[in-house]
Design a protein with these regions (language model features):
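Right-handed parallel beta-helix/beta-spiral solenoid domain characteristic of secreted/periplasmic
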Residues: 43, 69-70, 76-145, 171, ...
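Right-handed parallel beta-helix
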Residues: 87-88, 126-137, 161-176, 191-204, ...
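Short glycine/acidic-rich loop motifs that flank beta-strands on beta-rich extracellular proteins
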Residues: 71-74, 98, 113-119, 138-148, ...
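Bacterial N-terminal signal peptides
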Residues: 20-34
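Ser/Thr-rich, Proline-interspersed low-complexity disordered segments
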Residues: 520-552
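Acidic Gly/Asp/Thr-rich repetitive segments characteristic of extracellular carbohydrate-active
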Residues: 38-74, 115-118, 491-495, 502, ...
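Acidic, glycine- and Ser/Thr-rich low-complexity intrinsically disordered tracts
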Residues: 59, 102-104, 112, 279, ...
Length: 684
């Protein structure tokens, strides 16, 4: 067996002194051996595109680790079903997921050719492997839409025959720069594609949605496994634009063992914030996707910015109105950890914005939700069908579940909430316009199961029988503070689930699915080494110094009160934010409203914005318009929340509750089950 080696460089690698006879022999040998797979070496300065063009199926193109190759590069269509491999000369030294610290082992592919991707596929290109490459632009000033483009999302790809397929991206570092604006790491509009062991970072822009990975015009299947994934708006999204291929739904998507991560240096007000306010939305969003397995991942860091901070969103959208077949269905979300976010999972069945698209058949099981902020663990909008929420352990600040629907929306069916452990915080299961507990479930779903859940600290009479309300401190976690959510042998929830398993998460199953993946550490400054002090002679006594004035306290921003009350006919309510401590220089804080029982559409005017304090200013007001309706609905509430700050700290309180005192009179209606009395069922 002969394996040939070709050198592709700036100069001819075959010496001109070779005799014609030897050259002919070499050519014949090359022809014979390439059928078995040639190794094509492209040293620094060589033409990688020429090597790609000349490669045959089965060939391996080796590029020098540490060398830079200038693109853009195109993977052309070739006949044959053996892979053409493009890999670093030191790829074998990288085991598992690559990291930026291994840059020296990677060959560097760069481009600054307008908005062209560094690597793209030709129509129908197939059977390529990319291994051990660093893919980026030359400088932070180079704007680019896609660093890697697999397939096309426009009308040039309007039927399945032109879709690239059988593509493998392995141990790649795909990245922008800290201050750079670019739209996508990988544009994923291909078929049969694997992205594995890679590191995608610094994908962000201002006032533009950006994604580390985004696909909308490829059929799948996709395998996204063991990657570090950073994207400002959405780390991964499927949908978001209408497919140009009729009836296409990205399908058979496997997302396993990844770290979905947003650096806190992107967060306004964090000590590590770098001063660029990127558009931040969520960590994973499905708008058009079918048969999706999301298993064994970690979702870390998401906050209020362009959206409410919910990290996982399932919301079917016929985005541009030309794809009424769009769906989000048959999604499994299992063995994941969601940590340090404002909420959990939001599921929207359909809406006017969805233009007919439907979300259904979602299973959320055996996950941990921890360090969840003031928003809700789960949000169900417009009554999605066949939703299962089972065996989760949830530590949250907001409601367990908030349910809401547009007027006239039919009730949902097949809701199952079972065998979960829910911490204190917020309300339990809350139905907008109805209240808490069984009435909320019955008001929005014609069939449901709510059993063997522990809703810590809630009132049992509001809920169906067969549930518990034990405080989290009495659940019997092995080490709640340390993050070990296994149950002790004496826990009342040990082996007490519907299936005979522990109520809440099976930690062993979760860790087995996550493997070696771990949350990213919180960055801490490198300590300055302390020099060994030089011995000093015994000092001569000196007079006591004049006392130094106490240092000026750093500025903090907070509401003057944690609660306000306003009559419905008052027209507006004014809330005051104060700056205490130093008032030198400017400072700012963002604010946003959050519905509790009041609606930002029909009861008050929902809002978000930024308060900026000039030097010397110590207070600012926020005025909120109140709607004076004629509906008998009882008192209703909403929150105003302070979040990102600049040149100050957040004080306390940062959340204030506004109660709108109803001024309408009418007949009270008694809801028999749960003993809840309301003025009128009001659906928004």
């Amino acid at each position: 067996m002969f394996i040939s080696q070709i050198c592709v460089a700036a100069q001819n690698c075959v010496s001109p002194k070779l005799t014609n006879a030897f050259a002919i022999f070499f050519s014949l040998l090359l022809f014979a051996s390439t059928t078995l797979g040639a190794t094509i070496v492209v040293p620094a300065g060589g033409s990688l595109q020429a090597a790609i063009n000349s490669a045959a199926p089965g060939d391996t193109i080796v590029v020098d680790a540490g060398a830079t190759y200038t693109g853009p590069f195109t993977l052309p269509l070739k006949s044959g079903d053996a892979y053409i491999t493009i890999q670093s000369s030191r790829a074998s030294e990288i085991t598992g997921r690559v990291s930026p610290s291994q840059s020296g082992l990677l060959a560097k592919l760069r481009s600054n050719f307008g908005a062209e991707p560094v690597i793209k596929t030709a129509a129908g290109a197939h059977h390529y492997k990319l291994i051990g490459l660093e893919i980026s632009t030359f400088t932070a000033s180079d704007f680019i839409y896609d660093l890697v483009r697999l397939g096309n999302g426009d009308s040039s790809q309007s039927d399945l025959s032109t879709v690239p397929h059988h593509l493998i991206l392995d141990r790649l570092w795909i990245h922008g720069f800290q201050s750079q604006e670019l739209q996508r790491g990988i544009s994923l509009n291909s078929a049969e594609t694997t992205i594995i062991n890679s590191y995608i970072s610094e994908i962000h822009a201002i006032e533009t949605d950006t994604q580390a990975i985004c696909g909308w015009n490829g059929p799948g299947p996709y395998h996204i496994i063991n990657n570090h994934i950073e994207g400002a708006a959405e780390n991964i999204m499927f949908g978001g634009a209408d497919p140009k291929i009729p009836n296409l739904v990205p399908s058979d998507i496997e997302i396993r063992g990844n770290l979905f991560f947003k650096p806190l240096s992107w967060k306004v007000g964090d000590p590590s914030y770098l001063g660029r306010r990127w558009t931040i939305k969520n960590l994973l969003e499905l708008k058009n996707a079918r048969r999706v397995t999301i298993d064994g991942n970690i979702f870390q860091n998401n906050w209020v910015e362009a959206q409410a901070g919910t990290p996982v969103v399932f919301t079917a959208r016929n985005q541009d109105g030309n794809a009424p077949w769009s769906v989000v269905e048959d999604v499994t979300f299992t063995n994941n950890t969601v940590t340090n976010t404002q909420g959990g999972v939001s599921i929207l069945r359909t809406s006017a914005e969805s233009k007919g698209a439907i979300t259904s058949r979602i299973r959320i099981s055996n996950n941990v939700f921890e360090k969840i902020g003031l928003f809700d663990a789960f949000v169900l909008l417009n009554n999605p069908n066949d939703i299962q929420i089972t065996h989760n352990t949830v530590f949250k600040g907001g409601n367990i579940i908030t349910i809401d629907a547009d007027p006239g929306t039919p009730k949902g069916t097949g809701l199952v909430i079972r065998d979960n452990l829910f911490s204190e915080g917020g309300y339990g299961v809350f139905g907008s316009g109805i209240g808490e507990g069984a009435p909320a479930l019955e008001g929005y779903f014609s069939s449901y199961v709510y059993s063997k859940n522990n809703a810590a600290g809630r009132e049992g009479f509001m809920y169906p029988v067969g549930n518990s309300f034990v405080l989290s401190s009495q659940v019997g976690f092995v080490d709640q503070a340390g993050g070990n959510y296994r149950l002790t042998s004496s826990s009342p929830f040990k082996n007490a689930g519907t299936d005979g398993k522990d109520i809440g998460v099976d930690v062993n199953e979760l860790l087995a699915a996550q493997g070696t993946i771990a949350p990213a550490p919180t960055p801490t400054p490198t300590p300055t080494p302390t020099a060994t002090p030089t011995p000093t002679p015994t000092p001569t006594p000196t007079p006591a110094p004049t006392p130094t004035p106490a240092p000026t306290q750093p500025a903090s921003l907070q509401f003057t009160s944690s609660a306000y009350s306003v009559h419905e006919n008052a027209g507006s309510v004014t809330l005051t934010v104060t700056r205490t401590g130093s008032t030198a220089g400017s400072a700012s804080v963002t604010y946003s409203s959050l519905d509790v029982t009041a609606s930002g559409f029909s009861d008050y005017t929902g809002l978000a914005g930024t308060l900026t304090f000039a030097a010397g200013e110590s207070s600012k007001n926020v005025s909120i318009a109140i709607v004076n309706d004629t509906i008998v609905e009882g008192n209703e509430t909403f929150n105003l929340i302070l979040s990102g700050v600049s040149n100050a700290n957040l004080g306390s309180p940062t959340v204030t509750t506004v109660t709108i005192v109803d001024n309408d009179k009418g007949r009270r209606v008694k809801i028999p089950r749960g003993g809840v009395t309301i003025e009128r069922r009001k659906v928004r």
